Amino acid sequence: YQLYAKHHAEFTADEIYILSKELDTVIYFDALSEVSVRVSHDLFVSKKRINFDVDSVDKVIESFMSKDYIRIREIDSFLAFPSVGYEWNEYMLESFLISYSKKFVLLNNGQSLHNVAGAIVKKDGKIKEFEDACAAVLSESRIELKKSEALNYLADVNMITRRSYKDLD
């Protein structure tokens, strides 16, 4: 996947999906993230084509943080984010957090071609593990803490990308 991304300045999510079928493998998002930025649901671009003002973006993210974490989908307005030549959205935010942020990290159970999920936490904060972020989200919910209800809730609030997660007990 990294080799594909290195040889394509731009490529689409559909092209990656087709590649995964041709290779008969899952999509290795970590390899893609090494050399590309997902700038929208449909488009990935080379890291060489985008320049983030990391401190400014981190400052905007910090303005959304009122506790130890926020769900990535809680950032639903991108007007305050600095211009980077592409319109800001949750996919670009996910890429920024994975590859660029100095202050924040995205905790999730993996990336998805169709969804952005997880929690944004401070790198020097109390929450270090994805399971701890899920526990914090569930502790603030009013659901009965049974595994199926917890999984449904975490999927509904975009903490997990699918309604299964083996490490949730």
Regions inferred by a protein language model and the residue ranges of each:
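C-terminal non-catalytic scaffold/interaction domains in large multidomain proteins
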Residues: 1-169
